[in-house]
């Protein structure tokens, strides 16, 4: 089962928080102390909390649930996309558009438009347009792909959010809270854990730390889905005798 050790976290720098002057008092219980005016996160709390979160993500995977990975800042953007693709899930890694969850009806219309433009770009429709019109549609398609490309095949609201940087993605967390969607989030010492169902106290800036969270999350989801496949095969008598 997917799990992360204390050594893994130390190597990735998960324990380094923000400068002490930027701290959020709501994170006090997860802080071990300070070194050179930088808060040190208590990994004795992070390790079991993260592993509990991974176990829950595996359950979402087992139920064929949809997980939306959210991380729009530069340190997380590419890794968020990679983790989502590696686990056949969905992502928002550019900019969170207000109402992405709470106004899904409108978002669905934009996704429909994106898919129409994608078809037009390959079926010869663009070739029949003037250069200016074709350019305008291409730009519209690229803009929509940038903001909605990671959710265009989601087909409805997600069953869980996995967020890198609770402070930066507070709008996404609030929308998920309003809809009762469980939130898994990395919460650094400058952030509030409010609204996060599965808190992962840790560094949300170091690329190695971000990759550690995301790789483990993707692995947990995949393991959950594979467990379900194995269970179905066994039930149907497809498991070969050893």
Swiss-Prot record:
<keyword id="KW-0689">Ribosomal protein</keyword>
<protein>
    <recommendedName>
        <fullName>Small ribosomal subunit protein uS2</fullName>
    </recommendedName>
</protein>
<dbReference type="InterPro" id="IPR005706">
    <property type="entry name" value="Ribosomal_uS2_bac/mit/plastid"/>
</dbReference>
<dbReference type="GO" id="GO:0003735">
    <property type="term" value="F:structural constituent of ribosome"/>
</dbReference>
<keyword id="KW-0687">Ribonucleoprotein</keyword>
<dbReference type="GO" id="GO:0006412">
    <property type="term" value="P:translation"/>
</dbReference>
<dbReference type="InterPro" id="IPR018130">
    <property type="entry name" value="Ribosomal_uS2_CS"/>
</dbReference>
<dbReference type="InterPro" id="IPR001865">
    <property type="entry name" value="Ribosomal_uS2"/>
</dbReference>
<comment type="similarity">
    <text>Belongs to the universal ribosomal protein uS2 family.</text>
</comment>
<dbReference type="GO" id="GO:0022627">
    <property type="term" value="C:cytosolic small ribosomal subunit"/>
</dbReference>
<dbReference type="InterPro" id="IPR023591">
    <property type="entry name" value="Ribosomal_uS2_flav_dom_sf"/>
</dbReference>
<dbReference type="Pfam" id="PF00318">
    <property type="entry name" value="Ribosomal_S2"/>
</dbReference>
